Amino acid sequence: MARIRKSDQVIILAGKDKGKRGTVLRVLDDGHLVVEGVNRVKKHQKPNPMRNIQGGIVEKEMPIDASNVALFNPATQKADRVGSKVLEDGRKVRVFKSNGEMVDAQG
C-alpha cells in the first residue's frame, strides 16, 4: 500500500523548500512526487503552433523524492509517519503513527 497518494497534504522535510506545505499532484513510479507550489523551476519552452503552445519561460513544478516529504497530520498540525492497519472487515487502511487515526476520512 502506498504511504503517500495523490491529493494528500504533505510537508517538505529537506531541500530548498523545507517546511513548505502542499498537495500531491502526481505520484511517479520511481518514488518521486510532484507537489503543488514546491520545487518550482523555470523552463524555456519552444513555441509549437501545431499544439497551440506559445513559447517563452514557463514556471512549473518538478518531481521531489518521496523520502523528502512527510504526510501532514491535521490533528497535531505537524508532519507524521504513516503505517497501515487491517480493519475488522478486512480492509487495509493508512494510519498516522503518532495518534493511530486513519489518514483517509472515509476509511
Curated annotation (Swiss-Prot):
Single annotated GO MF: rRNA binding
SMART domains cross-referenced by the UniProt entry: KOW (SM00739)
A biological process term (GO) from this entry: translation
Disulfide bonds: none
Keywords, sorted A to Z: Ribonucleoprotein, Ribosomal protein, RNA-binding, rRNA-binding
Listed GO CC annotations: ribonucleoprotein complex; ribosome
Family: Belongs to the universal ribosomal protein uL24 family.
Presence of keyword Nucleotide-binding: no
CDD domains in alphabetical order: KOW_RPL26
Species of the source: Thiobacillus denitrificans (strain ATCC 25259 / T1)
Protein name, entry field: Large ribosomal subunit protein uL24
Statement: the UniProt record of this protein carries the keyword Cell cycle: no
Assembly notes: Part of the 50S ribosomal subunit.
HAMAP family linked: Ribosomal_uL24_B (MF_01326_B)
Record function comment: One of two assembly initiator proteins, it binds directly to the 5'-end of the 23S rRNA, where it nucleates assembly of the 50S subunit.
